[in-house]
Amino acid sequence: MEVNPPKQEHLLALKVMRLTKPTLFTNIPVTCEERDLPGDLFNQLMRDDPSTVNGAEVLMLGEMLTLPQNFGNIFLGETFSSYISVHNDSNQVVKDILVKADLQTSSQRLNLSASNAAVAELKPDCCIDDVIHHEVKEIGTHILVCAVSYTTQAGEKMYFRKFFKFQVLKPLDVKTKFYNAESDLSSVTDEVFLEAQIQNMTTSPMFMEKVSLEPSIMYNVTELNSVSQAGESVSTFGSRAYLQPMDTRQYLYCLKPKKEFAEKAGIIKGVTVIGKLDIVWKTNLGERGRLQTSQLQRMAPGYGDVRLSLEAIPDTVNLEEPFHITCKITNCSERTMDLVLEMCNTNSIHWCGISGRQLGKLHPSSSLCLALTLLSSVQGLQSISGLRLTDTFLKRTYEYDDIAQVCVISSAIKVES
């Protein structure tokens, strides 16, 4: 009795090859001076080499292309393409051939086959070809499972499969930082600055085609990665946005809440979704990759029960001449407040108007705009301070100092509007 029967050979052969872009052929030039012993021998060999560029033989980069010599690296965001070929190596006609390609990741199994229909028959020395594509969205171990089933002339059903394991690497390291904008000194606004640090983790340069921020429905975004020169927008990274291996680049964005959300004080509190980064790059011979981050979140700053912000203020004012500012008071609490406004003078800033006036009831998440008048008795950069809001129900006073700064100049100097 035979314990281990011989392994049956299949009539069909399966070949799987990864499809990638070719690379430019490179050679190492070897030269010498004419008075050296080899004379012009090395230079003549380079001129006769068909892979060199005429007139620039010492240039390492040639005019020819090199086909991929190995499987290579696969990075997150790239498109994995593979050529699958099933060839009939026998002298028999094989029937009901079904080729199935699945990609097994750490979290799911995907069917990549273009068609799940079986081929009626396959004659000797004929083949079935298929090309599969898949945008890689996970890092880690991936297994390409290729299964082939067919029926022989004798009616015997045959089946075999092959496994191809490969690793998906991370092409970019993305780090984000949030900065809450400050209006002058201490009056915190709703504007948020996002700094995105992107590092090239591959071994080849990248052309950064697009790095954009897709904001959430609560925010509008402004990109701060360009400057205006002669009426044209010029990128701060130059005309050639290449990112060399292990290099890092910083992108900056400003987000501001939409008007319908900014007017509702309670919505911007706590953890809010900012948006997500969309990064598109190109590598060897234009091979494209794309990466989208998950939704970015940040902790919104706390304003307390009452928030005071500035809507309008002049940059420069004249000495001992009244000027006007517009303040916005927002009730950030969940109860109705009855507020009283008090204005306290400082050594340089003097408020004009009645202190201790009633502002009336302010409902939750509602706002009130106030036009205030003041003057400065000291030249220079002066800080506006001395506003007090008192909640008559809780007898609680909210103090607002260093609200903003103005430049005070002599009245003999004309203030440019």
Curated annotation (Swiss-Prot):
GO terms for cellular component: TRAPPIII protein complex. InterPro entries: TRAPPC13, TRAPPC13_C, TRAPPC13_M, TRAPPC13_N. Part of the multisubunit TRAPP (transport protein particle) complex. Belongs to the TRAPPC13 family. This is Trafficking protein particle complex subunit 13.
